[in-house]
Amino acid sequence: MDWKTIFMNISIDSVIIYTWDKYWVIIPRDHVERLLWGELIQLYREKCFNNVFVLNWPGGFTNLRVWTLCLNILNTLLENQLSFYNLSKIDLFKKAYEKWFLPRFWVIYIWQKRNIRLWDFENNEKIWQYSFSELEDLEEVKKFENVFVEDVQDMEYYPKWMDKYLKYHTLLNWTDIYLVDNKTADWKWISIDEFKLKPLKSISPNYMMEPSVTIK
């Protein structure tokens, strides 16, 4: 990636855009369908970026769907001048776990109240999936140690007993990804080059959802 790269985290409830000169925009999911296209066009006019690094999925349906659609449309209008670099949070956090930066288990909330999951980075698999109301009452879940959650704008989606767990938020820049502990302000970093990402001309949302119907 060259220096004219913008960085987007579209996998949280309020999408964050960073640029090489520290310009950044936050767009809440409640306004994304109304504001995104105008913000994206204005950003391109001001910055004339060549590359887009996207921290993608798991995340909310609206953000993933609208952002990937608008990015693809923009690249079509620009006759494929843009290159996308796509990284999932599961791949990011797995790398962080392997470096001893993060605990083994991650409580994932993908912005549907029936889809709160526990991910095991040791075995790289989902252990369980519950609704929000079920999660409030699960004593066996409360006994889990070595767990973290991602800091988001709307923390009310997590049960109060999860306050004891580590909360991390993610920052991006030209060369590195930073993981910041909200309680201690300690931070760790991972070089983007470690992921050996290939340039893409289009980008797809991955909703981390299994089909609910079978077509015969």
Place the predicted regions along the sequence by residue:
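Conserved short-loop catalytic and cofactor-binding motifs
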Residues: 24, 58, 196
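Catalytic-loop motifs flanking and including active-site residues across diverse enzymes
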Residues: 36, 66-70, 89
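N-terminal small/polar loop signature for handling phosphorylated ligands or for N-terminal nucleophile
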Residues: 38-42, 49
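DPxDG-like acidic metal-binding loop motif
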Residues: 51-56, 62-84
